């Protein structure tokens, strides 16, 4: 599959997440997504065709700079202006010679970034979300994550993102893929005859964990090969940036 040059890859956005209570922000891991519809980062932008975590582009120094220069000042300034923010802060970042720069903020977890983060998260998310809602995360420990890599490959309906084909039959998505794979349903429904079919653009999220990005990716694509869905498609190169970095 065609791939952008390594030089171009430095402009790709990374996602850093934080849990905020209006005054404090706890970092909640990072991920790298793939926005373009087709292999080689070609085609139209989408809601996300895949993601993985941890992302090698998130060096400890980059995370520290993003926290000190972007996340904490943003939360503090919003509180000073009488608009304290509680919830998940999604910071879409670009690495530059002058450090991380903000491309966008969202007030939510990303999709499919949330799936890979939740599979790596080693704790109970509920106390953290309650802390955000109640206005105090200061007493909570820093979120802990498993060392494994998790990758998510999105299976979308043909025609996505412009005119996704709905109603096509999906077989094999409900099978047991083993302990290292989870398939999240995003746009599926049951027909009256019980068959599973597509009911949206991004339809399935095939997620797998591994000791490294290569193993996680192999497991995800092995699971995809077991799913019979002629009406769907997926990228075959999710994780290519991490693999290039070794």
Regions found by a protein language model. Name each.
Residues 38-40, 140-142, 189-196:
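Short beta-strand/turn micro-motifs at beta-sheet edges
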Residues 51-54, 152-154, 202-210:
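Short, well-ordered beta-strand elements within core beta-sheets of diverse protein domains
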């Amino acid at each position: 599959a065609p791939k952008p040059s390594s030089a171009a890859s430095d402009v790709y956005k990374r996602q850093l997440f934080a849990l905020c209570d209006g005054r404090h922000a706890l970092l909640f891991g990072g991920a790298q997504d793939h926005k373009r519809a087709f292999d080689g980062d070609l085609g139209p932008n989408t809601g996300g065709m895949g993601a993985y975590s941890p992302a090698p582009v998130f060096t400890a120094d980059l995370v520290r700079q993003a926290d000190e220069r972007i996340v904490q000042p943003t939360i503090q300034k919003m509180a000073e202006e009488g608009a304290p923010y509680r919830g998940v802060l999604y910071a879409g970042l670009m690495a530059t010679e002058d450090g991380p720069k903000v491309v966008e903020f969202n007030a939510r977890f990303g999709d499919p970034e949330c799936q890979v983060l939740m599979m790596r998260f080693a704790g109970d998310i509920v106390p953290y979300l309650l802390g955000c809602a109640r206005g105090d995360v200061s007493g909570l420990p820093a979120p802990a994550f498993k060392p494994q890599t998790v990758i998510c490959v999105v299976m979308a309906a043909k025609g996505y993102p412009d005119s996704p084909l709905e109603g096509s039959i999906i077989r094999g998505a409900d099978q047991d893929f083993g302990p290292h794979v989870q398939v999240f349903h995003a746009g599926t429904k049951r027909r009256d005859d019980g068959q599973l079919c597509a009911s949206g653009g991004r339809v399935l999220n095939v997620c797998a964990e591994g000791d490294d990005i290569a193993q996680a990716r192999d497991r995800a694509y092995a699971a995809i090969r077991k799913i019979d869905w002629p009406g769907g498609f997926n990228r075959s190169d999710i994780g290519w940036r991490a693999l290039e970095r070794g």
